[in-house]
């Protein structure tokens, strides 16, 4: 018979409550020990930060869901009249939880944001058009609006970037990380993104804080538009660290483009898995060295042995 490995104190603390439900009662000495270890505001950076007061991420997420639903789906005037005050009040409450710069008031920012919703809706609509034009698998605009993670991520980004431009601290970042968690698309709220931006698939995409992306840009899964790494990263805060992507650029899956001085010229095509840390002129076609394709039969004889050509008519 197997020996009982449960500590006697823990076994004694286990009781049956509510019929067949097994409830666990934490021993008092264990509870006291853990509370003493976790309690207080001076032990770690984490505890000091929490004690100083932070945004409730659950409240942020609930507001983001409501605001993006309004941006994507709400068109009935009566529906909008009832929904807009709720969104406005939710934003007002969140702004009261952060420190705004100078004489800026939460009331003024909420009014400014509400007036910008019209243009934000127009920008998101152009993103939907770009997705439909760029993805032959799309059967209609409804599929894109409801099902495409890129549109969800861009709806959050358009709102988060607006608040970022107002100088609102922390809130836009929490919003962008929520979108990242839900879609796999990581766009910093500081990134400047032009019209008709098309993300295909999207998983694993990273766009950094100081990136500038022009109009009609198309990127695929696994693309990084990031910064180069240095030992003292804090020294670069507030400086241009991420690339500029000009109009009508296509960046294929797995490409990595790094550096604040890097500019991808208009109309360029960046091939899959390319690693770029320098600028390229407009109209460039950039590809990694073509891989060698080798196919062998069951007897080990080469059936195909050739370099893979790339069709740049794309």
Residue positions per predicted region:
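Terminal amphipathic alpha-helical/low-complexity segments used for targeting or macromolecular assembly
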Residues: 2-177, 301-314
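Short, well-ordered coil↔helix boundary/capping segments
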Residues: 61, 236-240, 258
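Residue-level signal for pocket-adjacent positions within structured domains
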Residues: 139-141, 158, 180-182, 200, ...
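Short, positively charged
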Residues: 167-170, 240-244
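Short gly/ser/thr-rich secondary-structure transition/capping motifs
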Residues: 175-187, 230-235
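Left-handed beta-helix
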Residues: 183, 188-189, 194-195, 200-209, ...
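Catalytic core segments in nucleotide and nucleic-acid processing enzymes
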Residues: 221-234, 238, 273, 294, ...
């Amino acid at each position: 018979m197997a020996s009982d490995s449960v500590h006697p104190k823990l076994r004694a603390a286990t009781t049956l409550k509510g019929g067949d439900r097994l409830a666990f009662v934490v021993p008092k000495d264990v509870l006291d020990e853990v509370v003493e270890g976790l309690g207080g505001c001076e032990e770690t950076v984490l505890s000091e930060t929490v004690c100083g007061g932070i945004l409730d991420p659950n409240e942020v997420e609930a507001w983001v869901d409501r605001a993006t639903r309004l941006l994507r789906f709400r068109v009935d005037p009566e529906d909008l009249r009832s929904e807009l005050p709720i969104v406005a009040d939710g934003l007002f409450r969140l702004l009261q939880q952060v420190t705004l710069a100078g004489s800026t008031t939460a009331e003024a920012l909420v009014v400014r944001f509400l007036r910008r919703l019209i243009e934000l809706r127009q920008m998101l609509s152009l993103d939907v058009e770009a997705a439909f034009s760029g993805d032959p698998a799309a059967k209609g605009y409804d599929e894109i609006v409801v099902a495409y993670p890129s549109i969800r991520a861009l709806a959050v980004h358009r709102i988060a970037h607006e608040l970022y431009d107002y100088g609102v601290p922390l809130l836009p970042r929490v919003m962008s990380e929520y979108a990242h968690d839900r879609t796999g698309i990581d766009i910093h709220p500081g990134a400047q993104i032009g019209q008709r931006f098309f993300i295909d698939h999207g998983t694993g995409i990273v766009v950094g804080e100081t990136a500038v992306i022009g109009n009609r840009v198309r990127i695929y899964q696994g693309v990084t538009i990031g910064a180069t790494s240095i030992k003292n990263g804090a020294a670069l805060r507030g400086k241009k660290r991420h690339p500029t992507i000009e109009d009508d650029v296509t960046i294929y899956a797995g490409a990595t483009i790094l550096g604040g001085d890097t500019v991808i010229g208009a109309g360029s095509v960046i091939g899959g898995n390319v690693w770029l840390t320098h600028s390229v002129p407009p109209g460039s076609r950039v590809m990694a060295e073509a891989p060698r394709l080798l196919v062998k039969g069951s007897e080990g004889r080469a059936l195909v042995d050739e370099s893979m050509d790339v069709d740049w008519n794309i």
